[in-house]
Amino acid sequence: MDSRGFDSEGREFSSATEMWAHEIGAAADAPVSAAVAEPAPAPAAGSNGVAGEQEAGGGGKREEWYSKAIAYWQGVEASTEGVLGGYGCVNDVDVKGSDAFLRPLLAERFGAARRHLVALDCGSGIGRVTKNFLLRHFNEVDLVEPVSHFLEAAQENLTECMEVGEDTHKAANFYCVPLQDFTPDEGRYDVIWIQWCIGQLPDDDFISFFNRAKIGLKPNGFFVLKENIARNGFVLDKEDNSITRSDAYFKELFKKCGLYIHSIKDQSDLPKELFAVKMYALVTEKPKIQKNGKRRRPKNSPRMIRS
């Protein structure tokens, strides 16, 4: 059976398929994992929306889904407090948790080789994650963000960062494009970081995005998805048209994307009224089983996705 859930107005859905049919007029390839709906926590401390300033493809309800999300984020102040939904206090904790998750992954995947590391910050907002975290680890970071005043703020914030001597670790490119329309350059990125934004995409656009994004990974590159997690099923926020999925829901979507979980970690020390947050490191090849029964982590070999 499909995941059960509800929206922020109290409407219950027997499945994610039913919800997507109601919201965008089509079944959005919902995953199949039975679950019971939960009471809604406070609004998530997510950052920016991922629908585009440009209109999303498709017609009718799907366009309305994305345009409503963009309208919401266009009304949000381009500040840390704004993009974190009034929870600017979680910034330091968030950065610390992300750093602790990423450091060992970089060491394991890339070792001590002098490699020019490049990351993509998806749903980058004002450049909060890039400035406070990604630029510590990567020589270049590209930012993709659909809300123009957020991206303009990111350019200003990161220019200031460059002026204090961090020229060897720089924000390289700024793309004002929604994720559902974005395709990365082939083989450019060591890490594609996606945080507090994938909830803006219906399931079918979620799957399409990851399938396109695979071509952007270098050999041994990987995705990190950091997101709010519902205890069961899903919770749909009608204010900004975003969905909070359960861990089981995400895992079904990862399978549909042809992605494998390399590691998972919970974000700690968030305010109790917020959703839980998990970090997933995702790779494109299934870990092989060694003779001792342990899984060996192979290098990624990104392939061109053909239509």
From Swiss-Prot:
Which residues are recorded as binding S-adenosyl-L-methionine? 123, 128, 145-147, 179-180, 195
Locate the region Disordered. Answer: 38-60
- Pull one GO CC term from this UniProt entry: cytoplasm
Give the Enzyme Commission number.
2.1.1.244
Listed Low complexity bias regions: 38-54
Q: Which UniProt keywords apply?
A: Methyltransferase, S-adenosyl-L-methionine, Transferase
Give, as one word, the top-level EC class.
Answer: transferase
Looking up InterPro entries in the UniProt record yields: MeTrfase_NTM1, SAM-dependent_MTases_sf
What are its GO biological-process terms? Answer: methylation
Quickly give the catalysed reaction: N-terminal L-alanyl-L-prolyl-L-lysyl-[protein] + 3 S-adenosyl-L-methionine = N-terminal N,N,N-trimethyl-L-alanyl-L-prolyl-L-lysyl-[protein] + 3 S-adenosyl-L-homocysteine + 3 H(+); N-terminal L-seryl-L-prolyl-L-lysyl-[protein] + 3 S-adenosyl-L-methionine = N-terminal N,N,N-trimethyl-L-seryl-L-prolyl-L-lysyl-[protein] + 3 S-adenosyl-L-homocysteine + 3 H(+); N-terminal L-prolyl-L-prolyl-L-lysyl-[protein] + 2 S-adenosyl-L-methionine = N-terminal N,N-dimethyl-L-prolyl-L-prolyl-L-lysyl-[protein] + 2 S-adenosyl-L-homocysteine + 2 H(+)
Q: Name one GO molecular function term.
A: N-terminal protein N-methyltransferase activity
Function recorded in the entry: Alpha-N-methyltransferase that methylates the N-terminus of target proteins containing the N-terminal motif [Ala/Pro/Ser]-Pro-Lys when the initiator Met is cleaved. Specifically catalyzes mono-, di- or tri-methylation of exposed alpha-amino group of Ala or Ser residue in the [Ala/Ser]-Pro-Lys motif and mono- or di-methylation of Pro in the Pro-Pro-Lys motif.
What family is this protein classified in?
A: Belongs to the methyltransferase superfamily. NTM1 family.
- The protein depicted here goes by the name Alpha N-terminal protein methyltransferase 1
Lineage, opening ranks: Eukaryota, Viridiplantae, Streptophyta, Embryophyta, Tracheophyta
